[in-house]
């Protein structure tokens, strides 16, 4: 999860987030090299008199500055497209969970189980226990099995919402009348926090998401206790 004065991304806890972090580093390195080159050229222009201020035509230079940006864009686009296809791919999900956004809480339904559904509200600050996080804790956590592909079906009952869990590399819009889907897979057990990421009204900041990833045996025990 995030912490005060954090400069980087949250620790990756899913294969998709690991790919996104690698792509971020790849793109940042390209941006750094371009920025360094531009700064170097500007420095040369300001510190040396060996510049052609009256050049009217330079076919070689124009060819280079046309081809080079095209190559750079391709180097950025190819890994980006690969990750986009990975994020849309859903192969044999072990579990399907439907979540609906409301003003201002989330409701969840485990469609593979009968009558396994609940609402998830933020716990008010006055009701927090020692060690719990302000504006991030909920009364009902979403318990899911780790290391398994899980399909999330996401929609809304009223206005636009967005279901986002940064450490899992997930952000999907919840749109009234439309059913979006996403894949979740966690590499490790733990608690993963997120929030509504689409301004949805006066209590937009009070729609946290808490996923509890547990081993499959623990998930089966939990689901039996909830039915």
UniProtKB/Swiss-Prot annotation:
Subcellular location: Mitochondrion inner membrane
Ranges facing Mitochondrial intermembrane side: 1-14, 88-227
UniProt cross-references to InterPro entries, sorted A to Z: CcO_II (IPR045187), CcO_II-like_C (IPR002429), CcO_II_C (IPR034210), Copper_CuA (IPR001505), Cupredoxin (IPR008972), Cyt_c_oxidase_su2 (IPR014222), Cyt_c_oxidase_su2_TM_dom (IPR011759), Cyt_c_oxidase_su2_TM_sf (IPR036257)
Cross-referenced PROSITE patterns: COX2, COX2_CUA, COX2_TM
Membrane topology: Multi-pass membrane protein
Keyword Magnesium: yes
UniProt-recorded name of the protein: Cytochrome c oxidase subunit 2
Biological classification of the source: Eukaryota, Metazoa, Chordata, Craniata, Vertebrata
């Amino acid at each position: 999860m995030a912490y005060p004065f954090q400069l980087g991304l949250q620790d990756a806890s899913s294969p998709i987030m690991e790919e996104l972090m690698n792509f971020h580093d790849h793109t940042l390195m390209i941006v750094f090299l371009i920025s360094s080159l531009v700064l170097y050229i500007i420095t040369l222009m300001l510190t040396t008199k060996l510049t052609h201020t009256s050049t009217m035509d330079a076919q070689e230079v124009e060819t280079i500055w046309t081809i080079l940006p095209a190559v750079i864009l391709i180097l950025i686009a190819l890994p980006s497209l690969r990750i986009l296809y990975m994020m849309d791919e859903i192969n044999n999900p072990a579990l399907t969970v439907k979540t609906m956004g409301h003003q201002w809480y989330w409701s969840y339904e485990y469609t593979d189980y009968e009558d396994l559904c609940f609402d998830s509200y933020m716990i008010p600050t006055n009701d927090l226990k020692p060690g719990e996080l302000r504006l991030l804790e909920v009364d009902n956590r979403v318990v899911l099995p780790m290391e398994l592909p899980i399909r999330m079906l996401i929609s809304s009952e009223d206005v636009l919402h967005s279901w986002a869990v940064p450490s899992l590399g997930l952000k999907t819009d919840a749109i009234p009348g439309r059913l979006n889907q996403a894949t979740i897979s966690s590499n490790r057990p733990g608690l993963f926090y997120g929030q509504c990421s689409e301004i949805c009204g006066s209590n937009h900041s009070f729609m946290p998401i808490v996923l509890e990833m547990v081993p499959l045996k623990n998930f089966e025990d939990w689901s039996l206790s909830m039915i």
